[in-house]
Amino acid sequence: MKTEFSLAQLADPDIAEADKILRACVHCGFCTATCPTYVLLGDELDSPRGRIYLIKEMLEKDQTPTAEVVKHVDRCLSCLACMTTCPSGVNYMHLVDQARVRIEQRYERPLAEWLLRRVLAFVLPDPQRFRASMVLARLARPLAVFLPTPRPS
């Protein structure tokens, strides 16, 4: 993939690494067949190839991540299925990791999303907190009928 980073941008080791990864991608699309989010949603931007385009544009323009970029990068499950099928050996996961770091540094998430992410980061790594949250969830389950059903957009 052709990139258009400036020399000043390439002085940053992270951008230089991203440039190397981006140049390895030949747009063959083999990754799309193994990507669970693409298979489920059918949106090109939810495939590794689509995310690579979004990340490339974000990095080249050195812009704050948009809600669309964040949505599609967040949908990546980090399952690495795309990397196992890529004939060019694109280190997709490293590129997505860089994008996620940039998103966390520059993107201001809505309060509800920010709070949910903080709670999950607090609860999931600790088995005792996770067990306690499951007990609370079981007790709160009857209240679920009053909540709207989320749908992917």
Q: Locations of the language-model features?
A:
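Flexible inter-domain linker/hinge segments
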Residues: M1-K2, R151
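A detector for short, charged/polar N-terminal pre-domain segments
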Residues: K2-I15
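Iron-sulfur-cluster electron-transfer modules
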Residues: P13-L22, D46, I52-S153
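Short Cys/His-rich zinc-binding micro-motifs
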Residues: C25
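N-terminal cofactor/phosphate-binding cores enriched in small/glycine residues
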Residues: G29-E57
